[in-house]
Amino acid sequence: MNITRFSIKRPIGICMIYILVCVLGLISFFRIGVELLPDVDSKFISVIVNYPGASTESVEQQVTKPIEDELSSISHFKQVRSATRPGRAEIFVELDSQADADMVAIEATKKVSRIRKNLPEDIDEPAVLKRSSEEYPIIQIAATSKDNLDDIFALADSSFKERLQQAAGVADVDVTGGRTKEVAIEVDKDKLNYYGLTLQDIITAVRKENVIVSSGSVYTDALEKTVRLQAQYKAPEEIQHLQLKGAGGRYIELGQVANVQAKDKRAVAYSRVDGNEAVSLEVYKASGANIVDTADGVLQQLETLRKDYPDYVFTVVYDQSHFVRDSLSNTLKTLLEGLVTTGLVLYLFLRGWKSSMAVMIAIPTSLIATFFLMYLAGFTFNMMSLMGMALCIGILVDDSIVVLENIHRFLAMGKSADVAAEEGRNEIGMAAIAMTLCDVVVFLPIAFMQSATGQFFKQFGLTIVFATLMSLVVSFTLTPMLASRFYKNGVEEPKGKLWSRLDDFEAQTIAKYDVLLRKCIEKPKKLVLGVLAAFAVAVALVPLGIVGSEYMPRTDESAIQVNIELPTGFNADQTNEALLLFEDYLAKVPEIEHYMTNVTTTQSMGKLVIALKSSDERSKDVWQVAQEIRSFAKQNLGEIKVRVNEIQSSVTGVSGGRNLVRSPVQVELKGSDMDQLVADSAKVEQIFASTAGLKDIKNSYVKGMPELKVTVDRDKLKYYHATVNDVAQSFNAAIGGRSAGVLANDVQNHGNDTDIAVRFAGGSGYDIEDVRAIPVQTGRGSVFLGDLADVEEGVGPITIRRVNKERIINIQCNLTDRPLNEVVKELTQKLNAAGLKSTYEFSGQATTMNDSFAEMAMALSLSLLLIYLLLAVLYESVFTPFIRMFSLPLGIIGAIFCLLLTHNTINLYSLIGILVMDGLVAKNGTLLLDYTLTLMHEGMTAKAAVIEAGKTRLKPIFMTALTMVVGMLPTALSLSAGSETRVSMAWVIIGGMITSTVFTLLVLPILFLWLKEKFPSRI
């Protein structure tokens, strides 16, 4: 039985079916998750190892390389990167999209544990994290109180951190700032030499005397009791009386050679919020976790902390989920605005509430049914899926308008409502199926692209496919059924001046179109040549740079990060002073809501995270504020390097990473010769500086820090019966101090363990002679380090970066107002002419843009091929579908000119807009072509058929184009959070729909008649 006839005959049954579908859709609506972007982040496993006191090259050789080698064989391995700094190694492995981060983290832990015995004994235990060490925190919180900073830090590093980590989706919480306590054993070097002792002797003695030993069990007739030797230190005073055996067997107390006291560790990290000292907590989400859900969990835990610690103030400085929520809310708002404006247009064109009501019932029904399919597919509500739904409005309206307009035509012939509904639907059944399947094959290639970009747009494409298929079903069932009920008494034409004028306008438009079309058919050359010229000019605008291209539009996310870098050798105190000057300026900027300062253990570097007020509460956008900050830094901070980055979560999400402050232009130099890499990086930096449109240039290589190099004399080691390890232990202990255990459950430290550190008194002020005088215990007694090794001054690297086990230097910068493609093209020419001896390649957005654009071009080509094949099957002709294919070039004319007029660019979103436009404009061509063939089969000549088809389909074609344009205007004109990404796509669709609609009604008839004349038997 015909499905349309069944729907008309069984209205109650159809209503019940759609009520069930809507119930399932609404249930799904409340169960679908929410996030900014589809989860296409590459998954990472990071290994962090601290090696106190070790140089960069020592850490690289002894820690980084062995771990890199071991992790390179891990499951789902994609690539390994590392950053090695003095005393710290960060190795992070990028995994493929199929990886289970939890399982791979377990595997990584096992692999690192297996080689632990081959790593230096003095390293801290390696930490394996389910995130990239370069990932950006999703929430940054500052804790302040009237208590001392050491008390704040103690609570933050234990209770606060632990509480926040309980939130689902949290991978890690970094605590910065404040002060940590320690029991410092500061040794008098001269007294130590006098008694013939070394620092290692003290370290060993402290460790041996600070133990809990289980001694077994004792038994009575009724009980078994364990015996435990309790010998842990309770207070620093106990350590002071520790007995040491000096030279000649003489015993002394530790207090005779050292001062033992509880104190704050030397400040190597500062943190402030809005100029007040604080402890910062940076929350990182696990790979694959939902940002909104994770942030909700963190904020809930934060509320419990506020209740449990009323004397503490917790300030949320940065919360990425705010932008996510605002962006999604605004996307949903534009969707609803588009729906309302579409309804108004329909009311005017369909003459009254009945037809409009039929469409306004059909559209939400299709959308609600789509929720159910999205839920089954595991989709979330994000910018892409909601954007797909917003675009669907035009597609869904299109289906309903075509059906209702044709039903109106049959009603005007005097047929009953039931007959008109059935025959009106069936007459255009083939065209409807063709149009719907065209939409499906347009978006399927996008949905199944394998790259990160393809995965990013998967939900966008499939959401449109789901909605389009549901719309097709609705147009065959619900819409005809509603029409048969609404028009039971025929079409009631509304009365009044407005409707009369609309009728007159419609009749005049059709008459003028008839005249114009006949003139174009009689003299087609001018129109065809004009269209070809317009197409050539439009396409030329892109390579000429008049319409620029970039990877992604910039977004104002109300957040800025400032990184400062002082000349090499400056310490944390000096870096802190520079940041204090910066804070004085920021406190006076009215657009800023909060700012948080961090100076970390990389002593000559610091950062500021700046949260701006919401966009509707400030007069300047984020780029204007950032530029003013750059100007201040240039005028007031002298030689200090300052980089200002606008935080961009919506851009990095597409490129598969979460470093929200990474620059769009990056060049990586690779090679084994570090000196050559350094020389080439200086050339690249100069090229960047001489290229217009670039700012915030940063070279990852920093001139080495001054260092003292100790070169052992192996002959002397042999003579004194000493080893390299003896020298290393004594040297490291003297310079950086060594841990000698902990003061367990220290009541003075909120019950936390307090580190016991052994070092020389005044150890931070060593010169070369002090180093040579460091005592080393050998087989022949205690000697000076200078007796065993040569000590000389030198320079060592600050950071060594590696990619896939090869050293690299990264040079990056931000853009001003030049399109990314122009900059990359110019840089490529300059770099090729520079005579670089190292291998170079672009990374970041430049690479992603080229790859994504190429893949999008392939998807567009595949879509066109699939559409052609589909139409060839439906029409059983190889020439007829060829006519329809001209709809896209006709649309591209308006799309590119619209980008030019609105100052937008070719980017990933505007390319998607071209794909969407292709599916939409194809409907007009298919509708016109299908009715022309129908009339020819009824006996009309080709010319008469094409003119009559144009006149008959003018109204539905114009209505669908207008509703699509009006429906897209709220998106195109939006100034809300996150709208920047959608604007270019909306203008492409608007411009493409306008020119394609006009030219389709004129050019396609000419092309059809020309092909009919040339190949009469094949059309």
Residue spans of the language-model regions?
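Helix-loop junctions and hydrophobic alpha-helical segments within the transmembrane domains
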Residues: V317, V324, L328, L404, ...
